[in-house]
UniProtKB/Swiss-Prot annotation:
Domain annotation LRRCT: ranges: 129-167
Region (Disordered): 155-447
Keywords: Leucine-rich repeat, Repeat
Biased composition (Acidic residues): 163-194, 215-231, 256-277, 284-309, 336-374, 397-415, 433-447
This protein's name: Acidic leucine-rich nuclear phosphoprotein 32-related protein
Family in the record: Belongs to the ANP32 family.
Annotated coiled-coil segments of the chain: none
Compositionally biased region (Polar residues): 232-242
Stored InterPro entries: AN32 (IPR045081), Leu-rich_rpt (IPR001611), LRR_dom_sf (IPR032675)
Chain positions of LRR repeats: 49-70, 71-90, 96-117
Gene3D superfamilies: Ribonuclease Inhibitor (3.80.10.10)
Amino acid sequence: MDEIWERAVEAALDGQTDRLATRTLTLDGAVKCVQGRLPPPSVLEKFQNLQHLSVANIGVSSLEQFPRLGNLQKLILSDNRITVGLEFLVEAGLDSFCDLDLSNNRIQFVEDLAPLAELKLVSLDLYECPVTRLKDYRSRVFGLIKTLKYLDKTDAEGNERPESDDEDDEEDEEDEEEEEEGDEEDPGSGEIDGDERAEAPRMSNGHSERVDGVVDVDEDEESDAEDDESEQATGVNGTSYRANGFRLEAVNGEEVREDDGDDSESGEEEVGEDNDVVEVHEIEDSENEEDGVDDEEDDEEDEEEEEVDNADRGLGGSGSTSRLMNAGEIDGHEQGDDDEDGDGETGEDDQGVEDDGEFADEDDDVEEEDEESGEGYLVQPVSQVEDHDAVGNDIEPINEDNDPDEEEEVEDDLPIPDQSLASSSRPKRKRDDDDDGEDDDDDDEER
């Protein structure tokens, strides 16, 4: 039996070898006393500096041969079968003894507690003992033990017992030990682990920038400007817009290739050299188109002035064919409604051979209307003239000295555009063309 107690004590020490340094020893339920006796005194008397001893729930019924522990302050004997024999605690010479826990034992009478009057007990716990059911139990116990302040963890007035100063000191010591251990584990070398290093801002030339989620203001504005330019150049309903406000569409199934902004003038001159009949439709401006036309208004005026200068210099076929005829305001949904009104009125106007003076006047009118309305133009290339040898680039500016018969022959040689093109004319264009037709008849009669 002694060996069993020795092994239980070794297990409770958890590897601690210095018996004199031990302050607390807990043997709750470690051994079941068959005869209800405590272990031999020699097993526990090795711990002379022991202050807290707990031997709860070991089945002890007698305190005979209780070890002599002069520094013992608190003894826990709860959940046992103790009835009498408390005098053995007095014989053990427990001079520092002040806290006794006898809860859930078999003490039945107040007289059995009389030996405890010789001890300097401050706290006594008899919870769940039969003696607690006696009448005037509390007052009688307080009257028996004069030094007693707390019975069953409450004072004589029923106030709960606060934690003792000793217990507070023990807890403070434990907290300090834990803090010291934490300081040893974290020496505070200033190192940053992976997560903190990833979140730390990068330093570059004295500037700190967040790696994720930061966008430069200039870069944001540049990206917005690029988006606006791309939207202006994006095709709408199968058509594409130039930067100068013109919208290009495919005519007769032919695709129109949009040149870069720098090559826009050269592209128009190529159209003139190939003798294509260019039909210009004035379209209604949307909000986005108005913005594009306003931004490029100055460029349009420069281009139109350059075209007028080319016409004054007498640039033959390219000058005559690059003139843009104002065909009136047109909407894509209204073309089918205007077919009957525009029949037979575009043949003479679209031949592209007119007097330079008339072209100059007509261009001035177009320029004035453009400035007033701020509307863009729809440029549609028409299928090329079949007979390049007959007309081609050989068409020269008509002078007043030329023979009228020769002028009529040149006009007869030019192919008349497809009648379907006349369907895209509009009422406004009809009025302008009537006036131009009357001026042409008067000029022919004078010649």
